Amino acid sequence: MPAHVLNHPDHRDVTLQSIDDYGRQLLKAIEGLSIEEARWMPTPESNHILWILWHIGRMEDMWGWYLRGGGYSAWIEGGWANRLGIDAKRNGAGDSIDQVRNFPDLQVEEVTEYWQVARNLLIPSIKQISTRMLTIKHPEIWTHAPDRAPTLLWVLGRLPVENGQHTGHIAYIRGLYSSKLS
């Protein structure tokens, strides 16, 4: 079992095990990734790996922040929005293809570091969710759509599904890139 799994496994461990699993797969998928590969777009309307990696980090950071009921995030309070030169309001959801194409000139290592910082905040956030808290919503911080604020249970399920899919996207794009060179 991963080191962050609880001593007496419960509902949180499903999410913890899942994020550990896709995290290992993600690290494998980006190992040795060149900046040319990271910014390559299979079609003019496709996301590139670097943007997807950033979005994975933003999702872990945003959902960890939501699980905590607000407060500190790596993106804003931790200064990562400024450091990476991306508008603090963005998380990738709803980004236009022009925003993807015009993603800042960043190194893979910088974006990976942001993801890892966000993940280090996410794990304790998941661990603090008791069974009694699963139906809690935070409309007070979900200001763009307070009437659609998700339950903490929904967040625990959504996070590994979405980021597992994005990890698969990265591996797939990497495979497409290498096949175009053959």
PLM segments and residue spans:
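Active-site rim elements
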Residues: 4-17, 105-112
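Short, contiguous alpha-helical
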Residues: 2-5, 16-30, 35-94, 137-182
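Acidic/histidine-rich alpha-helical segments that form the ligand environment
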Residues: 86-136, 155-159
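Alpha-helix initiation/capping motif
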Residues: 9-10, 74-77, 83, 107, ...
